[in-house]
Every structure is written in structure tokens, then in C-alpha cells.
Amino acid sequence: MASSKFFTVLFLVLLTHANSSNDIYFNFQRFNETNLILQRDASVSSSGQLRLTNLNGNGEPRVGSLGRAFYSAPIQIWDNTTGTVASFATSFTFNIQVPNNAGPADGLAFALVPVGSQPKDKGGFLGLFDGSNSNFHTVAVEFDTLYNKDWDPTERHIGIDVNSIRSIKTTRWDFVNGENAEVLITYDSSTNLLVASLVYPSQKTSFIVSDTVDLKSVLPEWVSVGFSATTGINKGNVETNDVLSWSFASKLSDGTTSEGLNLANLVLNKIL
């Protein structure tokens, strides 16, 4: 897991000068319910995997399943008193498996949501949004396995979502059934640059998407961070959505340095 090694370096640099009680770091190589807020169908397996969607009585992915899981403690993403915004980095490994008699749907996402947020619509909305024009105060990186004609590009993709399921930026994603995917997401508050990369170590393939996002204008001061996933609403399109490990670090910054961006470039260059 080359990306895991470089992400460890990223964490160490991010936290070298940490001096605030609101600087956060955690690392789950196995999950337990103690440190998580589980919603709807999400659960932790006996082997410590985070299962965001569940199975039917035949042991296959259930149609219309929706699950979300967030770190139990709120994260301060910006400071109303000083105006500073946090830089963050997160790394996780997930696995999506599709039965032989089905196609994949709908996907999973890493998300920053308001504290106390409740699940939204299932299916293509990934449990994070719905069909209204509401301000969801949500930023997400989606790993979308099914084309939804009303808002998706025509290919499976990784997308950056800001208050809407219609991504502001996407990149093609060559989904590999049943293979572990390693993800690294970084946010540099000095440049507002959000970068997400996915690597399949077994395939030696990688995918990257990035765009600028002003978190302070989108999110509340305190957020919950975690995952949301859904299966398809039709019998022929279902999948498992399991997160195997997860690390996260955030640090409030004065915005005068770009160490988050430099570190992101370093790590991404190493794992490509």
C-alpha cells in the first residue's frame, strides 16, 4: 500500500506544528461502533469493516439500501472568530462488489455535512442530497458507479459535489469489481484546492479530480466527516459498499502557507 506510506508522511507534516485543541487526527485500521455515528443500514462487521449498505436474506446486496457513517466528534472546519479555515487530508480503502447477475449502483461518497445531518434520498442521490433546491451545506467526493441521466456524465466517474448531486468537476473512473481502491483526498485552505485521487494497487491504475472549493462559504463552522452510500433502486443494479480502513487529519491554518497543496502534489506524484 504505497499510498498509505506516503499518507503517513503527509499526516506527520500536517501535525508537526499543531497547537490547537481543534487539530484532529484519527486512524481506523479496524472499525468499531464506539467512534462512529451510524445511520440507516450502516453497520460494522465482526471483522471490523464498515458496511455502509446491507444484504438481503440471500446474502446479496439489498435493493434500495442507504447507509451513512460519520466520525463521532464534530470537526471545526473554520473559525468564526479568526476567519481561519482548516486544511485536511483523508485516506481510506474501500471495496465495491457486484453480484454476477447484476450491474453496479449507485456508489459511495466521502462527505462533510452539518452536525446532526440526517440521510437524504437513496439511489442516485447517494443519501446526501434530494431533488429540491435546498442548501445542503454539504461537500462530497463521490465514487459513482451508475449513470443517472438527469445529472451525471455518461461514464462511471469520481466527482466533487458542492451542495448538489450535480458535480462541479468529474473525471472518468474505470471501476474494478471486487478490487480494493485506495483513496487520498486533500484540501489546502490557502488555495481552496480540493484534490481527490483513487488508486487500484492491483491494476496499477489511478484517477485524479480537483477543483477549488471555498469551504467557508459552503459549510457551517463545525461539520461531521464520513461516508454515505446507496444501492440501486432496481433489482438489476446493486453492490456492496464497504470501507476497510480510514485515516483523517485536519489543522486550522492562517492561510499564509500552501503546505497542504505542496504535500498533496508530493504524495500524488509518488503514488502515480
UniProtKB/Swiss-Prot annotation:
Pfam families: Lectin_legB (PF00139)
Keyword vocabulary terms for this entry: Glycoprotein, Lectin, Mannose-binding, Plant defense, Signal, Toxin
Domain of life: Eukaryota
Entries under InterPro entries matching the protein: ConA-like_dom_sf, L-lectin, Lectin_LegA_CS, Lectin_legB_Mn/Ca_BS, Legume_lectin_dom, Leguminous_Lectin
GO MF entry, a single one: toxin activity
PTM characteristics: N-glycosylated on Asn-80; contains xylose.
Keyword match Signal: yes
Signal peptide: 1-20
Known glycosylation sites: N32, N80
Gene Ontology annotations of biological process type: defense response
Record text on subunit structure and interactions: Homotetramer.
Its job: This insecticidal carbohydrate-binding lectin is toxic for the cowpea weevil.
Note: Antibiosis properties of legume lectins are proposed to be due to the lysis of epithelial cells of the intestine by binding to the carbohydrate moieties of these proteins.
PANTHER family given in the database record: CONCANAVALIN A-LIKE LECTIN FAMILY PROTEIN, LECTIN
Family: Belongs to the leguminous lectin family.
Protein name stated in the entry: Leucoagglutinating phytohemagglutinin
Organism: Phaseolus vulgaris
